[in-house]
Amino acid sequence: MINRRKFLLSSSSAFALTQLPSDVDAKNGIKHYKLVAEAAEHIFYPNAQKSKLSLYNQQSPGPIIHAVKGDILEVDFLNLLDEPSTIHWHGIRNLNEMDGVPGLTQPAVEPGETFTYRFPLNDTGLFWYHAHTQAWKQVTKGLYGPLLVSDVNDETHHRDVLLVLDDWLLDDNEQLQLDSLGSLHDWSHGGRHGNFLTVNGQSKPNIEVPSNGQCKLRFLSAANARIMKFELNKKIPMKIIAIDGSPCAPFAVEKLTVAPAQRYDILVEDSSQLEELIEVSTSERLTAASFSTTKKTQEKFDVNSEHKPWYPHPQTTHAKIIDIHMQGGAMGNLAAAVFEGEEKSLRDLAQNDAKLWAFNGEIGGYGLTLADIALGDTVILRVWNDTRWRHAMHLHGQHFWVNSKEFGERNRQVLRDTYLMQPSEKVDLIFTADNPGL
């Protein structure tokens, strides 16, 4: 077994957002990193008892992986947990065998074992990496981190302000509540909601921003289920310039809704006005972070040249249409579903199999194939969220356009990998199948 000291040559023990040092093979364009998943302890409040977390490199969030478009990313992953794990590279149009889904694209990485992820970075933007084995537990305990891919000519990093969001469910001792992980109540009610908000692993941090110029706020939600909504002090307009990593034609919103796994890049025209980031999804307005200014800058982002989707909206005249009927959860419309070849009542599924959700009347395993799609086909996933719960829908290996009411006509200019579906909503997720895989 490889020990942590030998595997990880250097890391920070502080619970703050830091960049992971890399070994660069310039000749071959390879960026090499090391990630260790292991048990960790963390104190959420002064004088509180220690919480038992699982972290990458003893950091919360995991360290920033920063690379340049065109690089080959190579990450040596060491699993020092007492259970299997893998890493999914969320939002990356990845090689199938590098996608991190245990039992489908790779075997799970067993305790004490290593696995090397190696894949090209073909798109710029903000992505993230997270555990994909029992993600309901491992991600909730802290196994996630940001992945930032820049353009080789981008000289604006000093004005990027990364905001990694999470909400944690703490008990009366200010410790992460572990006993309720995987509870049927959470699974049937749209997921686990916390009661303690962190930004970059801290409660109400003070974050430095450049003064007298533009800055870019880059939001990433690692929450299990909570759908957050933010505004800035004085209701400063937030100009959306990228969604899920992909640039879009800029448009302003007063409040920004961020679902689990979504990312938004927000352009603030005058950063000297920034004072607070406020969470406003409930009647209680919460200060999520405060801002203070650093050195002056008069530089500006060239949004006209930069902010176009990676590729154009496809023609859909001859698209392959795949219907997906999503049912389940509490107060839903699922009475029974087929699981492992047998139709069972929802009560039976919940009590004996801990299964509560179904697509097209079936509870999927990796032995079921939704559809066979030819390379290059245009596909419309016609999804009906026939439940009482909002749900963030994510595609692996593909980005898509959405035909919905959320951004109206702007949807044709917005490319995503995660979309927040409303209860009873019907939407079309449209993509070109240009990345082979399962």
List each model region and its residues.
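Hydrophobic or amphipathic alpha-helical targeting/insertion segments
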Residues: Y117-N153
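N-terminal export signals
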Residues: R5-V24
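Secretory targeting signals
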Residues: M1-I2
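Acidic-aromatic/histidine active-site loop/patch
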Residues: D160-S211, L220-A223
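Asparagine-centered strand-capping/turn motif at beta-strand->loop junctions
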Residues: F77-L81, F219-A222, V383-T387
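Extracytoplasmic beta-sandwich strand-turn segments characteristic of Greek-key/jelly-roll folds
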Residues: S60-A67, W89-D123, S203-P205, M238-S272, ...
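A long-range scaffold signal marking pre-active-site subdomains of enzyme folds
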Residues: Q19-L20, V24-I92
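Extended terminal and domain-junction accessory segments
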Residues: T18-L20, V24-K34, V139-D171, C248-I380, ...
